Amino acid sequence: MILLISDLHLQEERPDISRAFLDLLDGRARHAKALYILGDFFEAWIGDDAMTPFQQSICQAMRRLSDSGTAIYLMHGNRDFLIGQAFCDAAGCTLLSDPSVIELGGEQVLLMHGDTLCTRDLGYMKMRRLLRNPLSLWILRHLPLSARYKLARKLRSESRTQVRMKSTEIVDVTPEEVPKVMAAHGVRTLVHGHTHRPAIHKLVVDGQPARRIVLGDWDRRGWALQVDEQGFQLAPFEFS
């Protein structure tokens, strides 16, 4: 069994989500061969050198799962792209490139966070290119902690404002982009998060039937994609 989740947006202000994640680590994930976390794991991350006690507790719980035999793979999201190798080493997880192709359920599957599919959101795409270039990343990681905290708060505030102002079509994936990206990677299944619109979409790629599986965000309930001998099963679960 393989589990895939995304968009937990872990933060101290939402202990219900944190407890649900810890329950997953101590429960279903213990029986999984691997756990994939496809971005926006934390609501914000300003650097491995600035871990709070809350974030350290999450890291330690992940390490326990990893030590028990479940492999953990973590992909950057738009909220936590400053997660680095130091955190991954401590948590016992592998940092996964976005995009990545893996073998899943007997086929090659493309994994993405999903934000790069939203090409109609021109303002966001411009900001992403700016923040993700190597020079910007180096500068961000070397800013004083106070400056990083201030910048993180500013970006989160602006992000919420922009999402409210923009149409749902703009902040969703661009329909034409999906088959193009899937064809470029030679896959018929894509799994991503980011949009907070869990669903399984059918489409055609290079004349062949294909599917796009969108993971759900954790808010009032959690979401997980389970892949086993029964196939691909996307389902919500209630927080205990």
From Swiss-Prot:
<keyword id="KW-0444">Lipid biosynthesis</keyword>
<dbReference type="InterPro" id="IPR043461">
    <property type="entry name" value="LpxH-like"/>
</dbReference>
<comment type="pathway">
    <text>Glycolipid biosynthesis; lipid IV(A) biosynthesis; lipid IV(A) from (3R)-3-hydroxytetradecanoyl-[acyl-carrier-protein] and UDP-N-acetyl-alpha-D-glucosamine: step 4/6.</text>
</comment>
<feature type="binding site">
    <location>
        <position position="9"/>
    </location>
    <ligand>
        <name>Mn(2+) 1</name>
    </ligand>
</feature>
<feature type="binding site">
    <location>
        <position position="166"/>
    </location>
    <ligand>
        <name>substrate</name>
    </ligand>
</feature>
<feature type="binding site">
    <location>
        <position position="121"/>
    </location>
    <ligand>
        <name>substrate</name>
    </ligand>
</feature>
<feature type="binding site">
    <location>
        <position position="40"/>
    </location>
    <ligand>
        <name>Mn(2+) 2</name>
    </ligand>
</feature>
<keyword id="KW-0472">Membrane</keyword>
<dbReference type="GO" id="GO:0030145">
    <property type="term" value="F:manganese ion binding"/>
</dbReference>
<protein>
    <recommendedName>
        <fullName>UDP-2,3-diacylglucosamine hydrolase</fullName>
        <ecNumber>3.6.1.54</ecNumber>
    </recommendedName>
</protein>
<feature type="binding site">
    <location>
        <position position="194"/>
    </location>
    <ligand>
        <name>substrate</name>
    </ligand>
</feature>
<dbReference type="GO" id="GO:0009245">
    <property type="term" value="P:lipid A biosynthetic process"/>
</dbReference>
<comment type="function">
    <text>Hydrolyzes the pyrophosphate bond of UDP-2,3-diacylglucosamine to yield 2,3-diacylglucosamine 1-phosphate (lipid X) and UMP by catalyzing the attack of water at the alpha-P atom. Involved in the biosynthesis of lipid A, a phosphorylated glycolipid that anchors the lipopolysaccharide to the outer membrane of the cell.</text>
</comment>
<keyword id="KW-0997">Cell inner membrane</keyword>
<dbReference type="GO" id="GO:0019897">
    <property type="term" value="C:extrinsic component of plasma membrane"/>
</dbReference>
<keyword id="KW-0479">Metal-binding</keyword>
<keyword id="KW-0443">Lipid metabolism</keyword>
<dbReference type="GO" id="GO:0005737">
    <property type="term" value="C:cytoplasm"/>
</dbReference>
<feature type="binding site">
    <location>
        <position position="40"/>
    </location>
    <ligand>
        <name>Mn(2+) 1</name>
    </ligand>
</feature>
<keyword id="KW-0378">Hydrolase</keyword>
<feature type="binding site">
    <location>
        <position position="194"/>
    </location>
    <ligand>
        <name>Mn(2+) 2</name>
    </ligand>
</feature>
<dbReference type="InterPro" id="IPR004843">
    <property type="entry name" value="Calcineurin-like_PHP_ApaH"/>
</dbReference>
<feature type="binding site">
    <location>
        <position position="159"/>
    </location>
    <ligand>
        <name>substrate</name>
    </ligand>
</feature>
<dbReference type="Pfam" id="PF00149">
    <property type="entry name" value="Metallophos"/>
</dbReference>
<dbReference type="InterPro" id="IPR029052">
    <property type="entry name" value="Metallo-depent_PP-like"/>
</dbReference>
<dbReference type="InterPro" id="IPR010138">
    <property type="entry name" value="UDP-diacylglucosamine_Hdrlase"/>
</dbReference>
<feature type="binding site">
    <location>
        <position position="78"/>
    </location>
    <ligand>
        <name>Mn(2+) 2</name>
    </ligand>
</feature>
<comment type="similarity">
    <text>Belongs to the LpxH family.</text>
</comment>
<keyword id="KW-0464">Manganese</keyword>
<keyword id="KW-1003">Cell membrane</keyword>
<feature type="binding site">
    <location>
        <position position="196"/>
    </location>
    <ligand>
        <name>Mn(2+) 1</name>
    </ligand>
</feature>
<feature type="binding site">
    <location>
        <begin position="78"/>
        <end position="79"/>
    </location>
    <ligand>
        <name>substrate</name>
    </ligand>
</feature>
<feature type="binding site">
    <location>
        <position position="7"/>
    </location>
    <ligand>
        <name>Mn(2+) 1</name>
    </ligand>
</feature>
<keyword id="KW-0441">Lipid A biosynthesis</keyword>
<feature type="binding site">
    <location>
        <position position="113"/>
    </location>
    <ligand>
        <name>Mn(2+) 2</name>
    </ligand>
</feature>
<dbReference type="GO" id="GO:0008758">
    <property type="term" value="F:UDP-2,3-diacylglucosamine hydrolase activity"/>
</dbReference>
